[in-house]
């Protein structure tokens, strides 16, 4: 009986070690890492361009979401590296808000696909929550027509949620 107990202890230790596996920047090629880094601010910019207003407050909300990410989204080395990098997105490369939205949503899907292949399930969930929290904080940062989130921002949030594969999150 002692042998089975020892084997069970070893299995538990191995499972705990596997749970603590953390993905880092080193797991990604430079172009892949750029995609993962740029997805959160892209989500924020999708919301900003959907509303056509309040850019200053919404940008401050995006910065605040980065600052608070570590405390809100658990222990994630991957998220720590993303937050520390503070990436920027050049939305001027696009000819219209619609083009930016379409390309941005594709960018979010690409980032999630990369994380699906390289990160743990917990890290993927943390990343999705971070991106959605950021997008929601940006949407709520500027009241429009008496609403904390405008209909166009709500639509953008739904599209972001779908692109992240985070239905109901």
Task: Please place each PLM-identified region on the residue numbering.
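Generic low-complexity, intrinsically disordered segments
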Residues: 6-8
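Small-residue-enriched hydrophobic alpha-helices in membranes
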Residues: 10-169
């Amino acid at each position: 009986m002692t042998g089975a107990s020892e084997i069970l202890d070893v299995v538990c230790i191995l499972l705990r070690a596997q749970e603590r596996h953390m993905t880092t920047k080193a797991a990604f090629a430079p172009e892949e890492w750029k995609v993962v880094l740029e997805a959160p601010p892209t989500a924020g910019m999708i919301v900003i361009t959907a509303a056509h207003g309040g850019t200053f407050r919404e940008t401050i909300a995006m910065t605040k979401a980065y600052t608070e990410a570590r405390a809100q989204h658990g222990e994630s080395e991957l998220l720590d590296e993303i937050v520390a990098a503070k990436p920027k997105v050049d939305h001027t490369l696009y000819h219209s808000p619609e083009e930016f939205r379409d390309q941005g949503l594709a960018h979010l899907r690409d980032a999630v696909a990369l994380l699906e292949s390289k990160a743990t399930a917990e890290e993927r969930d943390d990343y999705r929550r971070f991106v959605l929290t950021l997008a929601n904080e940006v949407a709520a940062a500027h009241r429009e027509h008496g609403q904390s989130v405008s209909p166009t921002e709500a639509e953008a949030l739904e599209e972001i949620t779908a692109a992240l594969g985070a239905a109901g999150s």
